[in-house]
Amino acid sequence: MSVIPYVIEQTSRGERSYDIFSRLLKDRIIFLGNAINDDYANVITAQLLFLEAENPERDIYLYLNSPGGYVSSGLAIYDTMQYIKPDVRTLCLGQASSMAALLLAGGAAGKRSALPNARIMMHQPMGGATGQASDIEIQAREVLKLKEILNSIYHKHTGKTVEQIQKDTERNFYMTADEAKNYGIIDTVIQIDRKQTE
């Protein structure tokens, strides 16, 4: 069981307590810090839509520290990011693997970043099937179609050729923040030492 911290704010109307994620949301920050499944994707998607309705002109910040997850769940978040009017700024801290790497790349151009020790990993979609041979064949075709879709999305956001992406994602393809910048997954590696600037 995870512990979710609460913060207390003083306002002119008294004291108010928020769980930390709700408090971040007030500042237009969405923290994606778990494996991506349908339930979690629904929460992230709802937060994106809420922030768009609240102010369609202000950027939304999506902080990522995730091992990835289900392709369909990740694509629901990705499509919402592309659909809403505000730019979505993405920031990787820790790791952005699998579908989380795709979400990192899917941020607004020029507004995708990572902290210096972040790790990014791309790979092809995985799947498994049991049952009759025809069922396994159907599932294999679906995984290959998803692979084409993911490669096309990476091509759109990185500028790499589909052939290069396909070659690189045949196995787990790990990158440092600087390597991810060179690859086109992100635009900036954040190097600011706040302690020295204060």
From Swiss-Prot:
Keywords: Cytoplasm, Hydrolase, Protease, Serine protease. It is found in: Cytoplasm. Pfam families: CLP_protease. GO terms for biological process: protein quality control for misfolded or incompletely synthesized proteins. One of its GO terms (cellular component) is cytoplasm. CDD domains: S14_ClpP_2. Its EC number is 3.4.21.92. The active site is at residues 98, 123. It is an enzyme of class 3 (hydrolase). It catalyses: Hydrolysis of proteins to small peptides in the presence of ATP and magnesium. alpha-casein is the usual test substrate. In the absence of ATP, only oligopeptides shorter than five residues are hydrolyzed (such as succinyl-Leu-Tyr-|-NHMec, and Leu-Tyr-Leu-|-Tyr-Trp, in which cleavage of the -Tyr-|-Leu- and -Tyr-|-Trp bonds also occurs). Coiled coil: none annotated. The keyword Protease applies. The keyword Amino-acid biosynthesis does not apply. Fourteen ClpP subunits assemble into 2 heptameric rings which stack back to back to give a disk-like structure with a central cavity, resembling the structure of eukaryotic proteasomes. Belongs to the peptidase S14 family. Cleaves peptides in various proteins in a process that requires ATP hydrolysis. Has a chymotrypsin-like activity. Plays a major role in the degradation of misfolded proteins. This is ATP-dependent Clp protease proteolytic subunit. The lineage of its organism: Bacteria, Pseudomonadati, Spirochaetota, Spirochaetia, Leptospirales.
